[in-house]
């Protein structure tokens, strides 16, 4: 996984990680958010070196609490609408249920942020989540 550049980037990554964890249904969004903000989870990412076959834990910058909470709050308040929008974007014979959970969490967090922060340029938000996706899938 590539290095996270800013606290805002860390906030977005933490939101993706939180929504990924939420998908398992074991904790509420509020419980997960508290664990992230307390530093109990989400302070490191795994940097994989496929050629060497090694994994290293790399610390990330702390999340910016306002953005992190805003994304999660937006998702909690608009989950049905967000998931409907994501499902509607797939071909007729596909649904978000067929999408890997990490990708689904990236789409959910990005959509939640777009809804919560209309003043933030769309290109910035999309670029940030593309970078997050690349860090997981490249």
Locate predicted features.
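N-terminal interaction/assembly modules
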Residues: 1-138
């Amino acid at each position: 996984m590539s290095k996270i550049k800013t606290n805002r980037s860390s906030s977005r990554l933490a939101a993706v990680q939180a929504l990924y964890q939420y998908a398992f249904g074991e904790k509420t969004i509020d419980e997960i958010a508290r664990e992230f903000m307390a530093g109990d989870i989400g302070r490191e990412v795994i940097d994989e070196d496929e050629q060497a076959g090694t994994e290293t834990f790399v610390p990330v910058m702390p999340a910016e609490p306002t953005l992190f909470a805003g994304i999660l709050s937006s998702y909690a308040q608009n989950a049905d609408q967000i998931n409907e929008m994501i499902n509607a974007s797939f071909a007729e014979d596909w649904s978000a249920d067929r999408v890997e959970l990490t990708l689904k969490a990236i789409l959910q967090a990005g959509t939640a942020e777009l809804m919560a922060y209309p003043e933030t340029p769309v290109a910035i938000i999309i670029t940030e989540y593309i970078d997050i996706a690349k860090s997981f899938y490249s």
